[in-house]
Amino acid sequence: ASIMDDWAKQFGLTETQKGEIFGVGLWPFAISIVLFSLIVDKIGYGLAMAFAFVCHVGYMVIVIAAPNIAGADPKTGYWVLYIGSFVGALGNGTVEAVINPVVATMFNKEKTKWLNILHAGWPGGLVLGGVLALALGDLDWRFKVGLVGIPVLGYGLLMV
């Protein structure tokens, strides 16, 4: 939430706008997980993960560039953050649509065990990300957004 507070100050966001940006970080996740779950076997895991990679990199570029794109216009700043968060959420849902069948296929004799381990890792990552963001304290919010690049680079290298 500290990044959101920084965004609110820099872009003059209202409480409603903050809520809308938080919300757009969620509902596109649901859309992409459903849509990609329906087509992932047809298009392949690699193409789906490439889409997710582009979305995650796009999120970082759009959001980090928001001050340059928006200038002094708070309305533009809101929309840049909104669009960036939308794109990032599409990537998140796509990863989820891919990782479940991949794990179930790789560990077909112990699916439940490994899917549970996988999903236990998500809150661990959220906690780790939160601790890192807090540890970075007053460091510019753009560096905190840049933390997303660590796992994105990781899975990007795995795809190569």
Report the location of each language-model feature.
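Residue-level signature of mid-helix packing/kink "hotspots" within the transmembrane helices
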Residues: 26-34, 127
